[in-house]
UniProtKB/Swiss-Prot annotation:
It is a lipid-anchor. Interacts with AlgX. Disruption phenotype: Cells lacking this gene in the mucoid strain FRD1 are phenotypically non-mucoid, i.e. non-alginate producing, and secrete high levels of dialyzable and low-molecular-weight uronic acids. This is Alginate biosynthesis protein AlgK. It holds the Pfam family Sel1. SMART domains: SEL1. The keyword Transcription does not apply. A lipid is attached at residue 28 (N-palmitoyl cysteine). It comes from Pseudomonas aeruginosa (strain ATCC 15692 / DSM 22644 / CIP 104116 / JCM 14847 / LMG 12228 / 1C / PRS 101 / PAO1). Residues 448-466 have a biased composition (Polar residues). Keywords: Alginate biosynthesis, Cell outer membrane, Lipoprotein, Membrane, Palmitate, Signal. GO terms for cellular component: cell outer membrane. Belongs to the AlgK family.
Length: 475
């Protein structure tokens, strides 16, 4: 069985004059507005954001083209992402910001070629030289993921040079390097100092400081930080997305003593104006049943569904998949998960398991492979384990020791429980000729994902922090 494989700018000045004339004549009533689009996006109103961005993008506004393309990339739909790349390319002819976004997309694009990675490096370097500091972090991530393409580049040396110039994004790149190297915990003091300095310029520092204090168990500093975060959010200086991410830190038991009560209070404050928080609230109840009951969870999810939040469909699918809160119903689970799959990699993992395990009455091996491959390449380590099991066990499918070995190795590298035992069984049955073939396929799969892909798969999204033009200020 073959391994499945994933599948001229208008004159801006002319449109500016036209739009200005219309605005003067009509008093701006009903006209598309980029500020409204951004505000709608921040509160999770995707329909309003998209309609405003689309109208402005059609008139050739580069910033609106970038905003619309960002939404299309975030959708997870391959057809929408192809449209996004086209928009980025149009805007990149005049906008350094668009060049940075195009480079960032090509760096993170699933199945991107070496030529696309090199184009990404060129675009990001060019945008950075033109004063677009947001290009710095994705450029470092690109070097970290594909070191074989730039053997002459030492990421740490580059970061040191940029930090010597006082660039805030260089400090952020250093934090990312610590994360990918697994040395974050050894640098908590430095990270705290850096993020106190740049807190008012990089909103991601709220997340980093909350993480530091959670890992240190410093309840007093955490309390002060949360008070400041609430004030900054109410003043419009911090988006709801960042408050949501801080609540996630508070609820994460792997970082230290979790505080689900405070996390819930934070999320309930922002949910009415930031609908994605309804899903985070439901997930909090899922993980901490003492915080509420099924009726409350479903109420949260209903609010999220009403706001067209795909993560709500993911969590509903999971509810009916595992039967933890509601009776198991694989068909309901499948229906919800299919709605979420375009933008939520976890949904593909659960769909793959439904098809692999025969939860719908029989095994659907090709459907299982298709969804598990998507999940695995999006950073879901458990999907690699499931693929290794599928091809080694041969349930409803011809066993394939080579494929089983490839995904078993990937699962072991990500420290998936029981993966070593499974890989040992696979290796014992693998003749030398097949082992050589498997090693080649493994190398190809690793290169397609990039080095450190699991650690960096979401960095280009979660660390895209805006820079506010203010002087650095300590807490």
């Amino acid at each position: 069985m073959k391994m499945p494989i994933l599948p001229p700018l208008p004159l801006a000045s002319r449109h500016l004059l036209l739009a200005s004339a219309i605005a003067l004549a009509a008093g701006c009533a009903g006209l598309p507005d980029q500020r409204l689009a951004q505000e709608a996006l921040e509160r999770g109103d995707l329909a309003t954001a998209q309609s405003n961005y689309q109208a402005l993008a059609a008139m050739g506004y580069a910033d609106a083209q970038v905003g619309l393309a960002d939404m299309q990339v975030a959708s997870g739909d391959s057809a929408q992402q192809a449209k996004a790349e086209k928009l980025y390319r149009e805007a990149a002819q005049t906008s350094p910001r668009a060049r940075a976004r195009l480079g960032k997309w090509l760096a993170a694009k699933p199945g991107a070629s070496d030529a696309e990675h090199r184009e990404a490096e060129r675009l990001l370097s060019q945008a950075f030289e033109q004063g677009e500091d947001s290009a710095l972090v994705p450029l470092i991530v690109l070097y970290l993921q594909y070191p074989q393409s730039w053997p002459e580049i030492d990421p740490q040396q580059r970061i040191d040079q940029w930090r010597a110039r006082g660039l805030p994004q260089a400090d952020l790149a250093q934090i990312i390097l610590y994360r990918t190297q697994g040395t974050y915990a050894q640098h908590l003091g430095e990270i705290e100092q850096v993020c106190q300095r740049w807190l008012r310029r990089m909103d991601v520092c709220w997340y980093e400081l909350a993480t530091v204090y959670q890992m240190q168990g410093n309840a007093e500093k955490q309390k002060v930080l949360l008070e400041q975060l609430r004030a900054a959010y109410k003043a419009g200086r911090v988006p709801g997305e960042r408050v949501d991410s801080v609540a996630g830190v508070l609820a994460d038991g792997e970082l230290g003593q979790p505080d689900p009560q405070t996390a819930q209070a934070l999320l309930e404050e922002i949910a009415p104006s930031y609908p994605a928080a309804w899903v985070s609230l439901a997930k909090l109840l899922y993980d901490y049943p003492d915080q509420g009951d099924l009726e409350k969870m479903l109420g949260y999810l209903k609010n999220a569904q009403d706001a067209a939040q795909p993560r709500a469909e993911l969590l509903l699918g999971r509810l009916y998949y595992d039967g933890k809160w509601a009776p198991q119903d694989p068909r309901k689970a499948e229906r919800h998960l299919l709605k979420a799959a375009a933008s939520e990699p976890q949904a593909n993992y659960y769909l793959g398991q439904i098809y692999r395990r025969g939860f719908l009455g029989k095994v659907y091996p090709q459907k299982a492979v298709d969804h598990l491959i998507l999940a695995a390449r999006a950073g879901q380590a458990s999907a690699d384990m499931a693929l290794a099991q599928l091809w080694s066990q041969g349930r409803g499918i011809q066993p394939n020791r080579v494929n089983a070995y490839v995904f078993g190795q990937l699962a072991v590298q990500q420290q998936v429980p029981q993966a070593s035992d499974l890989l040992g069984q696979i290796e014992a049955q693998l003749p030398p000729a097949e082992r050589s073939q498997a090693q080649q396929l493994l190398k190809r799969e690793q290169q397609s994902r990039g080095n450190n892909w699991q650690a960096t798969v979401s960095l280009l999204q979660s660390q895209d922090s805006p820079i506010n033009e203010e002087e650095p200020e300590s807490l």
